[in-house]
Design a protein with these regions (language model features):
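Short hydrophobic core segments
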Residues: 7-9, 37, 143-155, 272-273, ...
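N-terminal FAD cofactor-binding segment of flavoenzymes
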Residues: 21-79, 98, 170
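A conserved beta-strand/loop capping segment in the N-terminal third of enzymes
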Residues: 53-118, 122-128
Length: 411
């Protein structure tokens, strides 16, 4: 007999979300037994991160929302900024440590969810289920059996793709000596940053008060920067573009998100599935993941409760993924100017509609209307050449250290 109906591997956003949904008792439906396996402290455990998403409805993780906004601002390289109201949508920010505290509090009260701290060495199919091979902090090994396994760990390699770019970023949590931020608006894309020879870059500001914000430098390109390169880029944006003046750096956050048109497998065995970013929850053209993984885990939890096959659904529609493939190709080939494209879209499309489009929540005629506001010729050429392009492997870079808390820096 399996030790659990479900084993969830990894306690990041996807793993915690699925465990949280399965811990809830629903009258008339099954409540599966769950083992959540979290990596021990060290390099395998995700560092603190910031997640953003948008929604008009209340959600199960609202208590973890650190801040929310209904105004977004996009700044082209020159000229006036584009600003709009996102109503009824709200752009929300969650810090992973707040999210983990909320979920852990609820899981601790669940009689059907058990947590283990161990390194997962292998996940393998067996007749009627799967085995998870574990090693604990003392070096002891054991095998955990389950009917279903949901693995949220990052894959060791990516499937071959026609186009792969990296969205890589480095940010400072800053506190300024004087009020310089507008806490009512997010600086979503500020293209006044130096543009790389290949790809695009922009600044990103999430203000939580007039004197505090997360200030990030972001690139869409083929290669990450060095740690010194990231520090220089954020310092230039904070000091020379935003002109923050006297400031303290309270913490730093670094990350790399893969933007690819590769088909990401969501099932790796008869009883083994991938969820979250590992299961294709990341929107290829934007890097946003949180909303997609919530759609996946909601569907998986519902299937398990009803005794159905719990294969995670695609987090994004085929239509959305095809449009993303065209955009990635157009950016990677240099046919379109990234800052000009995004500035033009935000200037010509209502903010709320564009956010719904970026989350795959628009109808075909709305997608067509938005597509006609892009450079049609270059986008059409990119679409026509895609079927002829070979798929090539992509070597994942070694990500820089992320989410560390350095000594406070004053400038």
């Amino acid at each position: 007999m399996p030790e659990a109906n479900v084993v969830v591997v990894g306690a990041g956003a996807a793993g915690l979300s699925l465990a949280h949904r399965l811990a809830e008792s629903v009258p008339g439906l099954r409540t599966p037994s769950v083992v959540l396996v979290d990596a021990p402290p060290g390099p395998l455990r995700p560092p603190p991160r910031t997640w953003c998403y948008w929604t008009a409805e209340p959600g199960r993780f609202d208590a973890a929302v650190r801040a929310e906004w209904q105004r977004l601002r996009v700044r082209p390289r020159t000229g006036a900024p584009v600003e709009g109201n996102t109503g009824p949508l709200r752009y929300r920010m969650i810090r992973s440590d707040d999210f983990e505290r909320l979920v852990s509090h609820d899981l601790a009260r669940s009689p059907t969810v058990r947590r283990l701290e161990a390194t997962v060495e292998a996940v393998e199919d067996v007749p009627g289920g799967a085995h998870v091979r574990l090693r604990d902090a003392h070096g002891r090994t054991r095998v955990l059996s389950a009917r279903w396994v949901f693995d949220s760990r990052p894959p060791g390699s990516l499937p071959a793709a026609r186009t792969t770019l990296l969205q890589h970023f480095h940010g400072w949590f800053v506190r300024t000596a004087r009020p310089v931020f507008d806490p009512a608006a997010v600086e979503l894309m500020d293209f006044r940053t130096p543009q790389p020879a290949h790809g695009l870059s922009f600044g990103y500001v999430l203000p939580t008060s007039p004197c505090e914000a997360l200030v990030e430098y972001t690139e869409f390109s083929a290669h990450p920067l060095t740690p010194d390169g990231y520090e220089a880029a954020v310092r230039h944006y904070a000091d020379d573009v935003l002109r923050l003046g006297e400031r303290q750096v309270l913490a730093r956050e670094t990350g790399v998100i893969t933007m690819t048109d590769a088909p990401v497998p969501r099932q790796t065995g008869a009883s083994v599935f991938r969820i979250g970013a590992a299961g294709g929850a990341t929107r290829p053209a934007t890097g946003y993941t949180f909303a997609g993984l919530q759609r996946q885990t909601r569907a998986v939890a519902d299937a398990l409760r009803r005794g159905r096959h719990p294969a995670p659904p695609a987090a994004h529609s085929l239509r959305s993924r095809l449009m993303d493939a065209v955009l990635l190709r157009a950016l990677d080939s240099g046919r379109v100017d990234g800052p000009e494209l995004f500035s033009r879209l935000f200037a010509r499309v209502p903010m709320a509609r564009l956010l719904r489009f970026l989350d795959g929540d628009t109808r075909p005629h709305e997608d067509l209307s938005i597509g006609l506001r892009t450079p049609v010729g270059p986008m059409l050429r990119s679409a026509l050449e895609l079927p002829r392009l070979p798929r090539r492997p992509f070597d994942l870079p070694t990500a820089p250290a992320t989410g560390h808390l350095p000594p406070t820096e004053t400038a």
